[in-house]
Amino acid sequence: MPNLWFLLFLGLVAAMQLLLLLFLLLFFLVYWDHFECSCTGLPF
């Protein structure tokens, strides 16, 4: 039984890390797009 709980906990941690990585990638893409637009929009 402890092995099952350990695998469940490990899967939950892996899923949380994957979700966090996905959110970080999405935020980076949005921020990079906004940064690129603001850079190209500047007159100088």
Swiss-Prot record:
The keyword Cytoplasm does not apply. It is a peripheral membrane protein. It is found in: Host membrane. GO terms for cellular component: host cell membrane; membrane. Keywords: Early protein, Host membrane, Membrane, Oncogene. GO terms for biological process: symbiont-mediated transformation of host cell. InterPro entries: EPV_E5. The keyword Membrane applies. Pfam families: EPV_E5 (PF08135). Residues 32-44 are annotated as: Cellular DNA synthesis induction. Its main location: host cell. Dimer or monomer. Belongs to the papillomaviridae E5 protein family. E5 can induce cellular DNA synthesis. It seems to interact with a 16 kDa cellular protein. E5 seems to activate the PDGF receptor. This is Protein E5. It comes from Bovine papillomavirus type 1. The lineage of its organism: Viruses, Monodnaviria, Shotokuvirae, Cossaviricota, Papovaviricetes.
